[in-house]
Structures are given as C-alpha cells and as structure tokens.
From Swiss-Prot:
Record's comment on post-translational modification: Contains one covalently linked phycocyanobilin chromophore.
Binding residues annotated for (2R,3E)-phycocyanobilin, in chain numbering: C81
Principal place of residence: plastid
Coiled coil start-end: none
CDD domains: APC_beta
Function: Light-harvesting photosynthetic bile pigment-protein from the phycobiliprotein complex. Allophycocyanin has a maximum absorption at approximately 650 nanometers.
Lineage: Eukaryota, Rhodophyta, Bangiophyceae, Galdieriales, Galdieriaceae
Stored SUPFAM superfamilies: Globin-like
Membrane topology listed for this record: Peripheral membrane protein
Additional comment: Although originally identified as Cyanidium caldarium, these sequences derive from Galdieria sulphuraria.
Name the UniProt record assigns to this protein: Allophycocyanin beta chain
Quaternary structure, from the entry: Heterodimer of an alpha and a beta chain.
A Pfam family that the UniProt record links to this protein: Phycobilisome
Gene Ontology biological process terms in this record: photosynthesis
Amino acid sequence: MQDAITAVINTADVQGKYLDSSIIEKLKGYFQTGELRVRAAATIAANAAGIIKDAVAKSLLYSDITRPGGNMYTTRRYAACIRDLDYYLRYATYSMLAGDPSILDERVLNGLKETYNSLGVPIGATIQSIQAMKEVTSSLVGSEAGKEMGIYFDYICSGLS
C-alpha cells in the first residue's frame, strides 16, 4: 500500500530527481485536503452499517436478485454480499485517506472479477450496489469529500468491469 506522498517520492527517487514544482503542488493539494479526508473517514466509520444498509435498500433489496432463485436469496449469500460491501467501503476509505488506490488493487481487486465469475456472482448487481454506496456516502460526508470518495468507488467498479 502506498499513499500520495510515498508515490511521488518513489517516482522522483527512481528518476534520481529532486521534487519539482508540479510534484510540490500535488503534495500541497494532498495536505490541504487532509482534514477533510480525516473528517470524512470518521463519518464513514461511525455510519458504516447504515451506509451499507441504505445502499442495499437502494440497489438490491427489492430486485430479482433477492427473490427465490436469485443470487442473494439464501441468508448465506446475502451475508456474503453485505460482507463484500463492507470490504469495499472500508478499503475505499483507506484509499481516500492515503490519496492512492494501490491498496484497492492489492487487497480488493486482485483476482476478484475472476472469483466472482467462477462463483456466479452477478458483477452488474455488485457495481450497482457500489454506485448506490457512493451516493449514500456522498450524502453523509458532503459533496467535496463525496467526490473524493467517489474516485475510489469508481476505481473498484472499473476494476470489476
């Protein structure tokens, strides 16, 4: 896992260069939004169960997927879906705090699409629920922090597409 600071320093180090003005500006932006990211993470942590509940209600609860024969019909499958949504929310929050999506590749997306396909998990419904989670989260943390979180929710969706 990297953060925005490590990523730019590693890049400059590999190139054997000092930090130039564009890198310094990128770091300034990261530090200027630090308090916003920390407040958003605290709000998400305090409301995680509600975010997931609302996202499921908004995207999956009354669809064919939860009816008999649907992929979330049994309690076990439903619980697995909720567990996965919790992972996505938690790791998107970590990425937002770090300002870097690498943890999503390492801990969430690496092999996930293939695993879902082999288990018959509907990727479209998963993406729909992540998008709903993005909307619910944004309404809680505000538009600026919601936009930042949206980057990482979209990254997960893109990795699953």
